[in-house]
Amino acid sequence: MGLCQSEEEKVGSQKSRAIDKEIKQNQSNDERTVKLLLLGAGECGKSTVLKQMRLLTSKTYTADELEAQAKLVFTNIVIEMDHIVKAMPSAHFNFTDPMREHDVHMLTLYIKDMQHKSFHADAAEHVAKLWKDPVIKRLYAERRERNIRDIGDNTEYFFENLDRIAKPDYSPNSMDTLLLRTKTTGIVEVQFEIKKVKFRVFDVGGQRSERKKWIHCFEDVNAIIFIAALSEYNEVLFEDETTNRMIESMRLFESICNSRWFHNTNIILFLNKKDLFEDKIKKENITKAFPEYRGAQNYEETVAFIKQKFEALSNNPKKTFYVHETCATDTNQVQKILDSVISMIIQSNLHKSGLY
């Protein structure tokens, strides 16, 4: 009996060691998987940053993905022109050339049956003629001040490339893909591997209705990349025209950095759309969002002030923020920043897990 018990103990011990080994292996694999959460209010540029991460790893799009993107390019072009045209009455604008009314009529007919059609030269021609009209260009330039809904910052790029996009064999190039405006609904995940470390990056919807999904799902992330659009200091929310977009972004940042779920989580702040901000600040002061600002109306001083406003929102004086000024559509600049950020996260993660 004693011998039998000894054999059972031996077998049990072997199984225990095997289980311990598997647990340690799984723990090691988990420790070498870095989870990143992209956060920010709607229209801040999160989806573009996620696409840049994909480019960083040279992960190409499938034929099906490119086909879906092409359809979205077509849809965005037509719908966004329609939104601009429909904003004319409230702006008290009229076409100087009566032929543009014909283009609007044809565009309306196309939209009614758009789901059954592919984008073709006739539709592109009507959009192109409308885009050349000075009234349309003025309305586009004033889209934010007039709060014209669903007009992206990169719409002009697609209008200017209509000839290429309208060709029968069109397939989005890397710049089209990067600048394509997509609304994130729910949770989007991208996985890639850098320096033998696996990354799982989550992008969640930025509109208010999407935010309830954030905290309870992502308390174990290694780092948060929070994106705020610098250029939104003189804009209001589409879903609430009484709320300044910059102030809303700061409120969200405050709730995230002071959340008990993210008390020990690294937070990287991307002050995005620096190119648009640099141009806009020449025309309108940031006092639109910050009446207390008394500095000069230049890029350096205003950005420094905004940085301080964000950093002051943290209730934890020991919490370190990594702040970068970004233009998410500038591939070279963002790639360098992302490479630096990812290296920092890898080093921090390995240090915490005792692997470095």
Curated annotation (Swiss-Prot):
GO terms for biological process: adenylate cyclase-modulating G protein-coupled receptor signaling pathway. Its cofactor is Mg(2+). GTP binds at residues 25, 27-30, 135, 160, 166, 188, 254-255, 257, 310. Residues 14-338 form the G-alpha domain. Residues 158-166 are annotated as: G2 motif. Mg(2+) binds at residues 29, 166. Residues 181-190 are annotated as: G3 motif. Residues 308-313 are annotated as: G5 motif. GO terms for molecular function: G-protein beta/gamma-subunit complex binding; GTP binding; GTPase activity; metal ion binding. A lipid is attached at residue 4 (S-palmitoyl cysteine). Residues 7-25 have a biased composition (Basic and acidic residues). Keywords: GTP-binding, Hydrolase, Lipoprotein, Magnesium, Metal-binding, Myristate, Nucleotide-binding, Palmitate, Transducer. Residues 250-257 are annotated as: G4 motif. A lipid is attached at residue 2 (N-myristoyl glycine). SMART domains: G_alpha (SM00275). Residues 17-30 are annotated as: G1 motif. It comes from the Eukaryota. Gene3D superfamilies: GI Alpha 1, domain 2-like (1.10.400.10), P-loop containing nucleotide triphosphate hydrolases (3.40.50.300). Residues 1-25 are annotated as: Disordered. It holds the Pfam family G-alpha. G proteins are composed of 3 units; alpha, beta and gamma. The alpha chain contains the guanine nucleotide binding site. Belongs to the G-alpha family. G(q) subfamily. Guanine nucleotide-binding proteins (G proteins) are involved as modulators or transducers in various transmembrane signaling systems. Involved in behavioral responses to P.aeruginosa by controlling the expression of daf-7, a member of the TGF-beta family, in ASJ sensory neurons. This is Guanine nucleotide-binding protein alpha-2 subunit.
